[in-house]
Amino acid sequence: MILNRKSIIIILLCFIFINCSNKDSTTIHPTGFVDPSDSSGGSGGSGGGDTTQLDVQLMYPLDDQTKLFSTTWGAHQRTFIVHVPPNFDSNYSIPLLFVLHGYTSSATAIHSYSGFDQIADQENFIAVYVQGTTDLNGTTGWNVNVVGTFDDVDDVGFFKALIQYFKTDYNINSDKIFSCGMSLGGFMSYRLACELEEINGIGSVTGSHAVYYTCNPPNKKNIIHFHGNADAVVPYYGTSWSVPVETVHDFWANNNNCQDQSQITVPDFNNDGLQSTQFISYNCDENTDVVLYKMEYEGHTWFHQDWGDDLNSSELIWEFFKDK
């Protein structure tokens, strides 16, 4: 059964209300996925070609190292939270990590539960929590070809302009620009990997690729993904609108020309007797890697050991990125 966009919105809202706690044309295959070798293009909403300089305004500080900023992109006011590590000095370039919230959520929420401020302080990078736009229903989200009410938003162009802003004003390391996100924020991070050469790698926690989206990556990418196989919101094995998670993994392994794959059992930190699995595709071009954590009997959540999970996705995301 093929669901229309309105049905998808209703289903996502229902599932997120029940399940989400955050404890928060080209070749289409039968799976609905895209062959990375096909360069014929296809639909994908607004592109990322506009590099207009942003007029960024400070709204207010949250603390000495964290500030809320606003700007305008297209017809939308955009806001984002910036956290810089202690003793930040723009004379020295450091990495940048975008952190993206899920559908109906906010930058404030993922800033609160992800814990990336503390990791940024320890590892010396800038964390930027970007707020999605709000549709006419008052719902927040991203243009990722899943929820139709965001189709007119040029999110990719906005992130391209943000990257230029941080290069100019913060002197970030151009070779170490990353994005990660929860749920629809994971979808958005994948879209950035598909369209922006500047993105070195992405992390997805319970996100995926949209079935109705063409991904033609401009270069090789480092990919790390966490997903529960009992996720009822963005199912591990896919839906009519989201690609199966292991198919996404295989796509990026193919894109990166990875030659080998291994499977490792995740340590049972919470002693529940369930064995999760880490899939690693390696020996890839340009020293990239593609990693998938299949979390056994886990649902739609940001994984954290303090919440009873076997691992901390935030710590592992940065551990993966730091040497890339």
Regions from the language model: what does each represent?
Residues 20-96, 122, 151, 177-203, ...:
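A domain-start/cap signature at the N-terminus of enzymes
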Residues 71-87, 91-178, 188-191, 195, ...:
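Serine-hydrolase catalytic machinery in alpha/beta-hydrolase-like enzymes
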Residues 98-104, 206, 227-228, 296:
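The conserved beta1-alpha1 loop
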Residues 232-244:
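Conserved alpha/beta-hydrolase "acid-adjacent" motif
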